[in-house]
Amino acid sequence: MTRSIWKGPFVDTCLFKQKKIRWRIWSRRSCILPQFVGCYAQIYNGKGFVGLKITEEMVGHKFGEFASTRKTSSLGKRALPSKTKIKPIKKVR
């Protein structure tokens, strides 16, 4: 369900108080407004900060959409050896 239009976009009040060009943002739920275009933001993903330059295409989206909280899986790496070794079956005559 989307947010009601009469409420307007949610933006944390601390974002309006900052006057720097480079911001550190913990509020992933805040909407990106047109006045943020051209600024650099570092968005917290739960472990560290992810750098991002805000462009016009990002207006209306949330900050959290651009900082993934999950690790990417790497399918190309070799598998770990299993702990139990399979013993070969002896032939019976």
From Swiss-Prot:
Cellular location(s): Mitochondrion
GO terms, molecular function: RNA binding; structural constituent of ribosome
Keyword Ribosomal protein in annotation: yes
Main localization of the protein described in the UniProt heading: mitochondrion
UniProt entry tagged with the keyword Ribonucleoprotein: yes
Family designation: Belongs to the universal ribosomal protein uS19 family.
Record NCBIfam families: rpsS_bact (TIGR01050)
Protein name: Small ribosomal subunit protein uS19m
Source organism per UniProt: Marchantia polymorpha
